[in-house]
Curated annotation (Swiss-Prot):
Protein name, UniProt field: Peroxidase 16
Binding-site residues for Ca(2+) 1, renumbered to this chain: 66, 69, 71, 73, 75
Highest classification ranks of the organism: Eukaryota, Viridiplantae, Streptophyta, Embryophyta, Tracheophyta
The keyword Acyltransferase appears for this protein: no
Enzyme class: oxidoreductase
Catalytic activity reported: 2 a phenolic donor + H2O2 = 2 a phenolic radical donor + 2 H2O
Chain residues that bind heme b: 191
tRNA processing as UniProt keyword: no
Cofactor needs: heme b; Ca(2+)
Example of a GO MF term: lactoperoxidase activity
GO biological process: hydrogen peroxide catabolic process; response to oxidative stress
One matching Pfam family: peroxidase
Tissues expressed in: Expressed in the whole plant, but preferentially in roots and leaves.
Length: 323
């Protein structure tokens, strides 16, 4: 009985702590200190996006990687030695980092905003903006995060989903951050504007098993197309669009592709091949509105993961260095 009481107290404390942290995140957090923060960031992101489309997938992926390691505290942005030196982060495109840097520079040019907005919040805003720029849903971004002071290679180990993951592995990892299976599937939908390097999926098209060189869950025509784009013994760093039908548009085509066996990673295709998640894929494939609403909910929850607020952390003067 005593143990049960202790557990209940701990559980209540965790709920109270989580609620108090989330309560400190507000969409109008900078209304007095930097009232034009969203406009300034949006304009900087748009300018960067006009230079290269890679801005969009790079920024989205950067946000996800940041939040899944130590929480959404911009620790991924810190200079080496840091998280970005881990093999799972070395493929992060430089355009994502540059997007945040450009937005930070734009804010610092405004005397009212200089060193007032955290790099973590800049990344969260930039992520929303690239989603909108590619045709995705607009949504309010909760703000008030503080920047972390620690970033290590070791912290990335076993913290990010792998291309070979099956459903249970995906669910377990996302559940650690308070994200449901539906959240996980909705966030996977961001792959509609993503790209991947040949080395991340070559096993599926060349040596899946001794008897089956091609993964049987993979559409055979799609597999042969991938072989043409990723010839054997050629540079494994060649980048391939994860959505072969509308790679530059944030839509629900990703889920329609899964129905056809055209998920690039095992972790993509398993969302349809596993009957436990198939109905959600079918729902998102049949209704873009349903997907968009689920994505808004999921990315809002993602943006709350492990946030530092109040007096925790700092507001970095340089996003790549602690103060």
């Amino acid at each position: 009985m005593k143990n049960q009481s202790s557990f209940s107290i701990v559980a209540l404390l965790l709920i109270f702590f989580s609620s108090s942290v989330f309560a400190q995140l507000q969409t109008n957090f900078y209304r007095k200190s930097c009232p034009n923060v969203e406009t300034i960031v949006r304009n900087a992101v748009r300018q960067k996006f006009q230079q290269t489309f890679v801005t969009a997938p790079a920024t989205l992926r950067l946000f996800f990687h940041d939040c899944f390691v130590r929480g959404c505290d911009a620790s991924i942005l810190l200079a080496s030695p840091s998280e970005k030196d881990h093999p799972d982060d070395k493929s992060l495109a430089g355009d994502g980092f540059d997007t945040v840097a450009k937005a930070k520079q734009a804010l610092d040019r405004d005397p009212n905003c200089r060193n007032k907005v955290s790099c973590a919040d800049i990344l969260a805003l930039a992520t929303r903006d690239v989603v909108v720029l590619t045709g995705g849903p607009n949504y309010p971004v909760e703000l008030g995060r503080r920047d972390g002071r620690l970033s290590t290679v070791a912290s990335v180990q076993h913290s990010l989903p792998q291309p070979s993951f099956k459903l249970d592995q995906l669910n377990t990892m996302f559940a650690r951050h308070g994200l449901s299976q539906t959240d996980m599937i909705a966030l996977s939908g961001a792959h509609t504007i993503g790209f991947a390097h040949c080395g991340k999926f070559s096993k599926r098209i060349y040596n899946f098993s001794p008897k089956r060189p091609i993964d049987p869950t993979l559409n055979i025509r799609y597999a042969l197309q991938l072989r043409q784009m990723c010839p054997i013994r050629v540079d494994l760093r060649i980048a391939i669009n994860m959505d072969p039908t509308s790679p530059n548009t944030f839509d629900n085509a990703y889920f329609k592709n899964l129905q056809k066996g055209m998920g690039l990673f095992t972790s993509d295709q398993v969302l349809f091949s596993d009957e436990r998640s198939r109905s959600t894929v079918n729902s998102f494939a049949s209704s873009e509105a349903t997907f968009r609403q689920a994505f808004i909910s999921a990315i809002t929850k993602l943006g709350r993961v492990g946030v530092k607020t109040g007096n925790a952390g700092e507001i970095r003067r340089d996003c790549s260095r602690v103060n």
